[in-house]
Amino acid sequence: MRILLTNDDGIHAEGLSVLERIARTISDDVWVVAPEVDQSGLAHSLTLSEPLRLRPVSERRFALRGTPTDCVIMAVKKILDRKPDLVLSGVNVGANLADDVTYSGTVAGAIEGTLQGIRSIALSQAYQHAVGRDVPWDVAETHAPALIRTLMGVDLPDGTLINLNFPNCAVDAVAGVEVTSQGKLEFGLSIDERTDGRGFPYFWLRFGERAGDFRSGTDIRALRDNRISVTPLKLDMTDHAAQERIAQALREGSVA
């Protein structure tokens, strides 16, 4: 089985090394095409305003001056002589839960793999966001191989990818695996305005206290309870429940 790896934290990220070790427990045909630099938060974006620069790092490992989406496209369309059987994106430093998935370059790597007709899985490792806190990579590294093997045997509908999130706990404290839905997460975003040395303003996005929907069955609740979250995501974002309401409103409004 051929496996393609990518991420959004960059070619030198520790999570990518973890993912390589995970992948090599499953196959000896592992390829890496990852961003040259950190591309976190760029979601499913393409690089269209500048050229893509590809740099071989070592055998079957490449760094691309581009986004995770660019990386998957470059691998499938240029580097590989045939499509991989599996795309793994991650392991991200930090969870990608709830509304995070719309911003996530990690999830986007799996989205692009799915668009290319390849079984794709995004992997993220939760940790305590504080200076000096260690990321418990061993949780993902211990539990991911068996999960991936199981998920490869599931007959998923076309256009479906898997989003895996591993809890912030010790390996032996993991309380199981749960199939979840996306929760709801408020980021507490604000704008931090500062002034440079010439007196001109500049800005940073600032994350405040997060508020989450911890209802049973959500990805947020699973991680809070030290369970591994397995969330199937669909590329088709049509709100089918709203279609008839909108159609009825248009009919009543006599819109042609």
From Swiss-Prot:
<dbReference type="Pfam" id="PF01975">
    <property type="entry name" value="SurE"/>
</dbReference>
<protein>
    <recommendedName>
        <fullName>5'-nucleotidase SurE</fullName>
        <ecNumber>3.1.3.5</ecNumber>
    </recommendedName>
</protein>
<keyword id="KW-0479">Metal-binding</keyword>
<feature type="binding site">
    <location>
        <position position="9"/>
    </location>
    <ligand>
        <name>a divalent metal cation</name>
    </ligand>
</feature>
<dbReference type="InterPro" id="IPR036523">
    <property type="entry name" value="SurE-like_sf"/>
</dbReference>
<dbReference type="GO" id="GO:0046872">
    <property type="term" value="F:metal ion binding"/>
</dbReference>
<dbReference type="GO" id="GO:0005737">
    <property type="term" value="C:cytoplasm"/>
</dbReference>
<dbReference type="GO" id="GO:0000166">
    <property type="term" value="F:nucleotide binding"/>
</dbReference>
<feature type="binding site">
    <location>
        <position position="8"/>
    </location>
    <ligand>
        <name>a divalent metal cation</name>
    </ligand>
</feature>
<dbReference type="GO" id="GO:0004309">
    <property type="term" value="F:exopolyphosphatase activity"/>
</dbReference>
<keyword id="KW-0547">Nucleotide-binding</keyword>
<comment type="function">
    <text>Nucleotidase that shows phosphatase activity on nucleoside 5'-monophosphates.</text>
</comment>
<feature type="binding site">
    <location>
        <position position="92"/>
    </location>
    <ligand>
        <name>a divalent metal cation</name>
    </ligand>
</feature>
<keyword id="KW-0378">Hydrolase</keyword>
<feature type="binding site">
    <location>
        <position position="40"/>
    </location>
    <ligand>
        <name>a divalent metal cation</name>
    </ligand>
</feature>
<dbReference type="GO" id="GO:0008254">
    <property type="term" value="F:3'-nucleotidase activity"/>
</dbReference>
<dbReference type="InterPro" id="IPR030048">
    <property type="entry name" value="SurE"/>
</dbReference>
<keyword id="KW-0963">Cytoplasm</keyword>
<dbReference type="InterPro" id="IPR002828">
    <property type="entry name" value="SurE-like_Pase/nucleotidase"/>
</dbReference>
<comment type="similarity">
    <text>Belongs to the SurE nucleotidase family.</text>
</comment>
<dbReference type="GO" id="GO:0008253">
    <property type="term" value="F:5'-nucleotidase activity"/>
</dbReference>
